[in-house]
């Protein structure tokens, strides 16, 4: 995928990511990251979400995560208030060099996450559950980011 300026990450399954030639895995929590690092590194990306505290994010970074994710839903689909997510992204971007991925639950969250300093924006149901199609939702997000860039 990288020849198309995109990375293909599997949700977990580091062994499958390596066998299938994916670029890496997104792992949920420090334990999953620790279990997967040897399988993925150094050839593949090991990203980490499911981090409930700033401390957990720092531990993930120290353990070798290539990025940390803020705002991803837990197994029940719950996540912190968006304001708390944006604050965590801003704090991370100011203090650390390891990239931060902000999770946008809606297209309206894309611009504020970018403004907060997210290096990347992850989107879930707002793209894949969009009534007007995933391609249109991604194009909408890109337009929002382009607008944010021209205003900044």
What spans do the regions from the language model cover?
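Short beta-strand/loop segments at the ligand-binding rim of alpha/beta enzyme cores
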Residues: 1-9, 38-49, 93-103, 151
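Catalytic cores of alpha/beta
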Residues: 8-23, 52-64, 95, 99-123, ...
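Extended, intrinsically disordered, low-complexity segments
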Residues: 146-152
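N-terminal active-site wall of soluble small-molecule enzyme domains
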Residues: 1-42, 86
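Glycine-rich phosphate-binding active-site loops on the catalytic face of alpha/beta enzymes
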Residues: 29-36, 67-79, 114-144
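Glycine- and other small-residue-rich loops at beta-strand/loop junctions that grip anionic moieties
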Residues: 6, 25, 49, 78-81, ...
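Charged helix-capping and loop-helix junction motifs
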Residues: 81-89, 137
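Histidine/lysine/aspartate-rich catalytic loop segments that bind and position anionic ligands
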Residues: 46-80
């Amino acid at each position: 995928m990288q020849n198309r300026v995109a990375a293909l990450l599997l949700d977990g399954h580091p062994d499958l990511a390596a066998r299938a030639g994916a670029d890496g895995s997104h792992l949920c929590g420090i334990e999953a990251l620790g279990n997967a690092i040897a399988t993925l590194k150094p050839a593949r990306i090991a990203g980490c979400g499911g981090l409930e505290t700033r401390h957990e994010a720092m531990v993930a970074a120290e353990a070798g995560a290539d990025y940390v994710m803020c705002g991803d839903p837990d197994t029940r689909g719950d996540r912190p208030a968006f304001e708390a997510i944006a604050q965590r992204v801003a704090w991370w971007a100011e203090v650390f060099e390891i990239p931060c991925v902000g999770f946008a639950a809606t297209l309206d969250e894309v611009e504020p996450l970018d403004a907060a300093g997210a290096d990347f924006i992850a989107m879930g149901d707002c793209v894949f559950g969009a009534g007007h199609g995933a391609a249109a939702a991604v194009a909408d997000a890109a337009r929002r980011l382009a607008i944010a860039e021209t205003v900044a």
